[in-house]
Structure formats: structure tokens, C-alpha cells
UniProtKB/Swiss-Prot annotation:
Classification via Gene3D superfamilies: Ankyrin repeat-containing domain (1.25.40.20)
PANTHER family xrefs: ANKYRIN REPEAT AND PROTEIN KINASE DOMAIN-CONTAINING PROTEIN (PTHR24198), ANKYRIN REPEAT-CONTAINING PROTEIN-RELATED (PTHR24198:SF165)
SMART domains: ANK
Signal peptide (from-to): none
Entry coiled-coil feature ranges: 251-278, 311-352
Protein name from the UniProt record: Putative ankyrin repeat protein RBE_0984
InterPro entries: Ankyrin_rpt, Ankyrin_rpt-contain_sf
SUPFAM superfamilies documented for this protein: Ankyrin repeat
Source organism superkingdom: Bacteria
ANK repeat intervals: 50-79, 88-119, 123-154, 159-188, 210-239
């Protein structure tokens, strides 16, 4: 591209190299471009005494045209160097992407080694997150097929943004469509500091295909709650993906998908609430029955009434935490109550029954308070249910 700068020279490469470095430092692009054709390829990749190569210096000085020429003269091995001598681990690509050098990035991407292209720097930037952030769709398209999934899903330190979120933010439709299938569930379901999901952001920007793909992926991941997320703060407070999609022209099919998802989500929540009620009902009934028994003990007749109540309640709590079926326990408690006429006998049999279950499960209980203080009573205990 810059062949007209070529000329013969008998000057030693070392002297040319020093001139090149000084010209780059002084941002003298014309002199740099005149010197490059006179030098050998290996000289152009050589670091100076401070560890800086001509390319890293040119990137630092924002000499985009110089960078493009240097990349064209360097070997694949030389452009794949990972700079570890500085505090932040960088490659030529990450440095170029930070500067927004589109041409340099496009030339580097297909030639770099897998290790270099998948570098994660100290700020958790990757080649892909930087390219998406700098709105370089063609570079992203080249990167995605050659990057590891775990690197694609890295989120940068400051805003915890994934490559997909950056691509949505910059309206990079094709890039988003490539990323959605390989993005993790965690990143797909990410809610940002403004309380927006990726789906909400895509709907807000009118990215129809991206919305459709996100909905499909989120349904596949059973993330109906994220699909139906409602923003709780800021200017968009009260908005959802559905309400934002309804404001976009040509989004009728997207709205239909979201409405269907909303109905499924409501049904799912209703079933969850019903299940919780069913699970809590036996415990409620058990509690009522125990309280009724305790109330039958006349106040003052037994000094350890509160201890009894605490002991039994603690055992039931432990059984519940260990995923026991309280419905079955409730049925057995009813048998105990029906088979024992004396209140003290009922309570003693009840504790004995709970202890049997606990002992069978080798549960280590802190509460081993016995009801024997109630006195000797005749107990009828039914264990026919094999608990």
C-alpha cells in the first residue's frame, strides 16, 4: 500500500530501528512510513530496551495507518505476542480495539493464535467485549467462531457487561444473533444497574429478531420470570419487555409471544402459590392440634408447659427442614390423639413418635427434653403406618 516510500539504503538496521522508534514516539507518521520499507520484518517486531515494539508504541501513539503497515509486515507469531511485562495483560488486538482501530483489528483477528485471541486482561476485557463496545461488527463476526465459549461469556469488571449486552447496546443485530446461542444462561438473564434485562433493552431498541431469539432461549432455559420482569426504578419504572414491544411498529408477533409467556408465567406462579399453601397446611393443622393439647394442661399444673411446647415444636421444625412429608406425620399424630384419652399420654406419645422418626434418620437434635416429668401414664402408640 505504501510502496512509493521504498528506497535502497546502506544504513545499518540498528540505526534505522532507533530512528523508527524515535519517529513513532514523536508521532511523525511520514518518517515512520518512509523507514518501514527499508527494514527487515524481524526488525519491525523487535522490542526496544524498555520492552516496547514499534507496533505497541504506534498503538499507544494512536498512529492507525502506521499500525496497519506494521501488522502487514509482521509474522503471525509476532502479532500473537501477549504483553506480560506490563501490569495489565494485553495483546496487540486489545490495544487496537481500545483505540477503536477497525482496520487493524480486522487484519489481526484472523491471524492471531487461539491463546492470544482468547486473552482476558486485568480489567476482564476480551477481544470480543472490546470490539462490541467499540461498535466493530465485522471484527466481532470474525472473532466469535474462533473464541472459546467461556471467554465469550466473560463480563468486564466495571459494569459487568457481557459481549452480548454490548452488542445489543450498539444495535449489532447480526452479532447478537451469533452470540445468543453461545451466551450462558446467567448472562442471558442478567439485570443491569438500571433494572433492565437484555430482552427489555432489545425491545426498547426495536431489535425484532434479537427479541424473538431471546424469548425462545429464555423459554428454553425456563426463565419466564426474566421474560416478564418489570423495571422497578428510573425513567422506565413500570415498563416491561411487553409494554416496550407494544410501542414498536411491526412487533405484533413479538407481543403475541410475550403475552403468551405472561399467561404461562401467571399460571406458573399460581401453581407455586397453591403448592406452598398445600405444604403449609399440614404444619398449620399440626400446630393447632398441639396447641389444643397444651391448652388442656391447666396453667400452673405443670411448670414445664412452655418447655414441652418448645420441645415438640423444635422437633417438627427439624423434620420439616429434612424434607419430611408433614402430611404423613399429621396423619400419625391424629392416630396418637385418637388412641390416647389422657392429655399427658397424648403428649408423651407424640414426642415418642417424633423421636422415633428423628432417630431413624440419625438427626442430631439439640432438643432432647423428655415429657416424662408429666408422670407415669399409660400410652397407646400406633406405628402401623411404618414411619
Amino acid at each position: 500500500m505504501f510502496a512509493f516510500f521504498r528506497s535502497s539504503s546502506n544504513e545499518p538496521d540498528g540505526t534505522l530501528y532507533n530512528k523508527l522508534i524515535e519517529a513513532i514516539k514523536s508521532r511523525n507518521s511520514l518518517e515512520v512510513l518512509a523507514l518501514i520499507p527499508k527494514m527487515k520484518n524481524e526488525e519491525l517486531a523487535k522490542p526496544n530496551i524498555y520492552g516496547n515494539t514499534p507496533l505497541s508504541l504506534a498503538l499507544n501513539k494512536k498512529l492507525e495507518a502506521v499500525c496497519e503497515v506494521l501488522v502487514s509486515r509482521m509474522s503471525d507469531k509476532d502479532i500473537s505476542i501477549i504483553e506480560t511485562y506490563v501490569e495489565h495483560r494485553e495483546t496487540y488486538f486489545t490495544l487496537a480495539a481500545i483505540k477503536g482501530f477497525k482496520g487493524v483489528c480486522e487484519n489481526l483477528a484472523p491471524r492471531m493464535s487461539n491463546e492470544a485471541i482468547n486473552v482476558i486482561n486485568a480489567r476482564k476485557h476480551t477481544a470480543l467485549t472490546l470490539a462490541a463496545d467499540k461498535n466493530l461488527p465485522q471484527v466481532c463476526i470474525k472473532l466469535i467462531p474462533i473464541m472459546f465459549d467461556e471467554v465469550i461469556n466473560v463480563t468486564e469488571n466495571r459494569h459487568k457487561d457481557s459481549a452480548l449486552r454490548k452488542a445489543i447496546w450498539n444495535d449489532l443485530d447480526v452479532v447478537c444473533q451469533m452470540l445468543i446461542p453461545v451466551t450462558s444462561k446467567e448472562n442471558i438473564n442478567y439485570i443491569d444497574v438500571s433494572d433492565r434485562t437484555l430482552l427489555i433493552l432489545a425491545a426498547q431498541k426495536g431489535m425484532k429478531v434479537v427479541c424473538k431469539m431471546l424469548i425462545s432461549r429464555m423459554i428454553e432455559d425456563n426463565s419466564l420470570d426474566i421474560i416478564n420482569h418489570v423495571i422497578s426504578k428510573g425513567e422506565l419504572k413500570g415498563e416491561s419487555a411487553l409494554s416496550l414491544a407494544e410501542k414498536q411498529k411491526g412487533f405484533e408477533d413479538i407481543c403475541e409471544l410475550l403475552q403468551k409467556s405472561h399467561e404461562e408465567y401467571k399460571e406458573q406462579k399460581q401453581k407455586e402459590n397453591e403448592k406452598k399453601c398445600e405444604e403449609s397446611q399440614p404444619k398449620k393443622i399440626i400446630s393447632e392440634d398441639i396447641n389444643k393439647l397444651l391448652n388442656e394442661l391447666k396453667d400452673g399444673a405443670y411448670n414445664n408447659k412452655n418447655i414441652i411446647e418448645f420441645s415438640i415444636s423444635a422437633k417438627i421444625e427439624k423434620l420439616e427442614k429434612n424434607a419430611n412429608d408433614l402430611s404423613e406425620i399429621y396423619t400419625n399424630i391424629q392416630d396418637i390423639i385418637n388412641h390416647n384419652k389422657n392429655t399427658k399420654a397424648k403428649l408423651l406419645a407424640l414426642e415418642k413418635h417424633l423421636n422415633q422418626i428423628i432417630d431413624a434418620q440419625t438427626i442430631n437434635t439439640e432438643q432432647q427434653i423428655s415429657l416424662e416429668a408429666l408422670g407415669d401414664v399409660s400410652v397407646e402408640f400406633s406405628n402401623s403406618r411404618g414411619v
